[in-house]
């Protein structure tokens, strides 16, 4: 083994879907890591991006995504990839290849860009880009521990069915959506509900909508 030899890593996503029995909405992705030589461990940082330009959109979906990309006439300028999240993953010792799980915690907060994007899609797939950085630990020819950084030019693609997102959210919020309010707005809404002896938040919103036509 050359003194400066270091593992050459390759990454691919083999599967993706809903993480069963998670306490909060979570997607999971099966990540295959391959190496040209034995590895002690990998401290991996996985960056996820939504490659929004890599799928078609119906007119209904364009309307649902207007807050992200503007009206149909603006899409040529505004349609772009969206940063989703970063996930740290610890990979244990392996030779040749190993399969690890990348859990991605999700939210139904529509103020979050990725959530708005998923919520605006009716069907099809979400094109995802995975970028990989971090540090690989390995032994040299004399058995001494060596450390090398992982270049961010390592990438993998995966297409996640929109149905996986909807299944996950329906499992955690059955028949419901989620709305975030500033505290002042919530206090006013709560006072309106109490003042009008309304029993649920649905009744409160309906009363306000009916009042304003």
Where are these regions (language model features)?
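Low-complexity, acidic Ser/Thr/Pro/Gly-rich terminal tails and inter-domain linkers that flank the onset
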Residues: 1-28
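A short beta-turn/strand-edge loop motif at beta-sheet boundaries
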Residues: 35-42, 198
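Short aromatic-acidic-glycine turn motif
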Residues: 49-60
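Short beta-strand elements
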Residues: 63-73, 137-178
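Short, basic amphipathic alpha-helical segments that act as recognition/interaction helices
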Residues: 199-213
């Amino acid at each position: 083994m050359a003194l400066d030899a270091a593992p050459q890593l390759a990454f691919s996503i083999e599967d993706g879907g809903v993480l069963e029995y998670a306490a909060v909405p979570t997607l999971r992705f099966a990540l295959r890591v391959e190496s040209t030589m034995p590895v002690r461990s990998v401290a991996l940082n996985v960056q996820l991006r939504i490659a929004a330009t890599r799928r078609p959109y119906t007119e209904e979906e364009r309307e649902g995504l207007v807050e992200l990309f503007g009206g149909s006439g603006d899409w040529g300028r505004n349609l772009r990839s969206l940063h989703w999240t970063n996930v740290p993953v610890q990979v244990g010792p392996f030779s040749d290849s190993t399969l690890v799980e990348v859990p991605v915690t999700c939210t139904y907060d529509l103020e979050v860009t990725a959530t708005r994007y998923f919520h605006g899609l009716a069907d099809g797939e979400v094109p995802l880009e995975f970028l990989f950085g971090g540090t690989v630990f390995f032994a040299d020819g004399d058995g001494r521990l060596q450390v090398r950084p992982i270049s961010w030019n390592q990438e993998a693609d995966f297409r996640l069915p929109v149905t996986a997102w909807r299944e996950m959210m329906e499992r955690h919020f059955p028949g419901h959506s989620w709305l975030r309010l500033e505290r002042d707005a919530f206090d006013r809404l709560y006072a309106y509900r109490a003042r009008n002896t309304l029993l649920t938040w649905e009744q409160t919103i309906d009363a306000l909508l009916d009042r304003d036509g």
